[in-house]
Amino acid sequence: MSIDKSYCGFIAIVGRPNVGKSTLLNKLLGQKISITSRKAQTTRHRIVGIHTEGAYQAIYVDTPGLHMEEKRAINRLMNKAASSSIGDVELVIFVVEGTRWTLDDEMVLNKLRDGKAPVILAVNKVDNVQEKADLLPHLQFLASQMNFLDIVPISAETGLNVDTIAAIVRKHLPEATHHFPEDYITDRSQRFMASEIIREKLMRFLGAELPYSVTVEIERFVSNERGGYDINGLILVEREGQKKMVIGNKGAKIKTIGIEARKDMQEMFEAPVHLELWVKVKSGWADDERALRSLGYVDDL
């Protein structure tokens, strides 16, 4: 009797903030799991995205962007989460941006040089490079930095060459039993995903006005008799002025955030959602390691 082989492994997606790691993860999975925003540092937790195709199961770890500044407790914890992801995976996808190369990229590269896992270099946003003649010399420069498994120019936004990345990943998955059922796409709870959706809308609708010192706590997540969910979200900010910014003129801003978050939740949970949002000032939460632990920022370290 022949037993079908199965393949399964962990892949870390790493890179400095805002190079498109979350967009790449979402594209590899075929749907939105990790929040994306033009603001740097929007991924605060390691999110596991699971993609199963026949005998192959790829488990993606979406790290916070590794970055130089470690002054605040939240930044130290985010760097720790990103570094710990690199250590225990079969493969690393190192995402960089077009022809840009920064000290933060250099720092990530140095961490990868010390690691044992093979590294795919994904050069993202190549469709945005204005001077196409600059691209080839830059790719040659990158190739000289480390013995990469492969260098793939991609656009996570449009999907260009993302299938190439997926094919390389499949080829390097070790023979192993699958960790998750084939219909799983993330190991995160619905409660966690609800908070991520609200946080994405805050980033999207407040943009540059909003500091990083905002987080979301789901105080209530219960099934109701209508076959849907009642969800209460608490938005924590550090100052009174930030609270006014989130609420907006006559509550217009928080209403928009709530409407858009509810739409995404209904799509993700495939059920009606009744969502209520509040804003509360809790000064200094991003500097307070104990508060961060209570909000789940170190639950996976």
Curated annotation (Swiss-Prot):
Q: Where in the cell is it found?
A: Cytoplasm; Cell inner membrane
Domain (Era-type G) ranges: 7-175
Q: State the similarity comment.
A: Belongs to the TRAFAC class TrmE-Era-EngA-EngB-Septin-like GTPase superfamily. Era GTPase family.
Q: Where do the segments described as G1 lie? A: 15-22
Q: Which organism is it from?
A: Shigella dysenteriae serotype 1 (strain Sd197)
Which residue intervals define the domain KH type-2 in the entry? Answer: 206-283
Asked if the record carries the keyword RNA-binding, the reply is yes
Kindly state the subunit structure of this protein. Answer: Monomer.
GO term, biological process aspect, one: ribosomal small subunit assembly
* Membrane topology per record: Peripheral membrane protein
Q: Which residues bind GTP?
A: 15-22, 62-66, 124-127
- PANTHER family, alphabetically? GTPASE ERA (PTHR42698), GTPASE ERA, MITOCHONDRIAL (PTHR42698:SF1)
Query: What protein does this entry describe?
Result: GTPase Era
Region: G5; residue ranges are 154-156
- One matching Pfam family is MMR_HSR1
G2 as annotated region, ranges: 41-45
Keywords of this entry: Cell inner membrane, Cell membrane, Cytoplasm, GTP-binding, Membrane, Nucleotide-binding, Ribosome biogenesis, RNA-binding, rRNA-binding
Record GO terms (molecular function): GTP binding; GTPase activity; ribosomal small subunit binding; small ribosomal subunit rRNA binding
Q: Where is this region: G4?
A: 124-127
Superkingdom is Bacteria
State the protein's purpose: An essential GTPase that binds both GDP and GTP, with rapid nucleotide exchange. Plays a role in 16S rRNA processing and 30S ribosomal subunit biogenesis and possibly also in cell cycle regulation and energy metabolism.
Keyword ATP-binding attached: no
Q: Where is this region: G3?
A: 62-65
**Gene Ontology cellular component list:** cytosol; plasma membrane
Do you know which InterPro entries this protein is assigned to?
A: G_ERA_dom, GTP-bd, GTPase_Era-like, KH_dom-like_a/b, KH_dom_type_2, KH_sf_prok-type, P-loop_NTPase, Small_GTP-bd
